[in-house]
Design a protein with these regions (language model features):
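Compositionally biased linear targeting/interaction segments
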Residues: 2-358
Length: 358
């Protein structure tokens, strides 16, 4: 009996020891994991400032590129075949600083890649009138019965008064929504503001980009307007046609055929002919390649005198507003920065906005 009791006590002691070892092992593993997480957080936190300065350096690099391009006398235009847009480049890119541009720039312990997008390749939503908005909806394939409410709701959102247009929408309607809000009654600052406007659904905003997946539930909550029992198949989205920041003139060297069709008198055939006409290598005679002046569009057989006058009124060959995207990286840490850069004169650029997304 005494031996059995001792054996039982030894067994209990062994179990207690094993449990203690297991608990201590789990505590040690948890502590090691938490220390690893804290170390990673500390490393990322220490890189935050450096990443931001890398992003700002990338923006300055792009400003330098834009000034170099604008001050090149051999290329009095902005086009997609130039180095700033990722193209092979024209005469100014064969030698000099533009010929030595690096897509990935190494700076200190980090690096950044850059991308410049021409905002003047789209129409300005704040200056687009009723006719241009209607033409955009026709191009997208919106039902004729829905055009007037959407167009007038957009114009009511932008205009400074509270007078409701025919089938339009002002604050008295938006204040009854959940959550309630008011009409902007001012210029659109971000193109995504369109999603707050009655009639502008995520499908209408994104176009084909929204057809492969259901819309963001938050966007549908913010914009409950329109039918949800069917998925519209729009040819293009409002985000592809308009921008809130631009000079107000469309660059015929960078605009898509869809954007060019927003110009009065320009149909699909003319727009595609204009796009095709700007292709090819630089030609100092102006017969092929990018348009050096808007008047050179007359070399396109499909463009008659009346259409040329409309193009000269709405278009330019110089761009003055750009969106810069910088991807900064230090070790395993990375951050994407964005900036809106305007170029009022060939030798002057200004950063209107600098931001990043988590």
């Amino acid at each position: 009996m005494r031996l059995a009791r001792r054996s039982s006590q030894h067994g209990i002691a062994l179990i207690i020891v094993m449990i203690s070892i297991f608990v201590l092992t789990m505590l040690a593993a948890g502590f090691a994991y938490s220390m690893k997480v804290e170390t990673m957080l500390a490393r990322h936190a220490s890189n935050e400032t450096a990443l931001q300065w890398l992003g700002r350096s990338g923006v300055e690099y792009c400003r330098w590129i834009l000034v170099l391009q604008a001050t090149c006398p051999a290329e009095p235009y902005d086009s997609l075949n130039q180095a700033w847009a990722g193209g092979s480049g024209g005469p100014c890119s064969t030698n000099g600083p533009l010929a030595e541009l690096e897509q990935e720039v190494h700076l200190g312990q980090g690096s950044f890649t850059w991308k410049i997008t021409d905002l003047d390749a789209k129409a300005n939503i704040n200056t687009a009138g009723e006719g241009m908005l209607e033409k955009a909806l026709m191009l997208m394939g919106v039902d004729a019965a829905d055009m007037t409410p959407i167009v007038n709701s957009i114009l009511d959102w932008i205009d400074p008064d509270d007078q409701t247009r025919i089938e339009g929408t002002e604050s008295d309607y938006y204040e009854r929504q959940r959550p309630p809000y008011q009409a902007k009654n001012g210029p659109i600052d971000d193109i995504s503001e369109l999603l707050f406007i009655k009639g502008v659904t995520p499908y209408l905003y994104w176009g084909p980009a929204s057809s492969n997946s259901p819309p963001n539930p938050l966007l549908e909550k913010l914009n409950p307007f329109g039918s949800r029992d069917r998925t519209p198949n729009y040819q293009v989205g409002l985000v592809d046609l308009f921008t809130p920041i631009s000079s107000g003139k469309i660059n015929i060297n960078t605009a898509s055929a869809e954007v060019l069709q927003l110009i009065p008198g320009v149909d699909q055939i003319i727009a595609e002919a204009i796009v095709a006409g700007r292709q090819g290598e630089f030609d100092p005679t102006g017969l092929t390649g990018p348009y050096r002046t808007v008047a050179e569009v007359r070399r396109i057989p499909e463009v008659n005198m009346l259409v040329q006058r409309q193009i000269e009124q709405f278009c330019d060959v110089r761009s003055r507003a750009f969106r810069v995207e910088i991807n900064a990286k230090i070790g395993a840490s990375s951050r994407t920065f964005y900036a809106i850069v305007v170029r009022p004169t060939p030798r002057e650029t200004q950063v209107v906005n600098f931001y990043w997304k988590y």
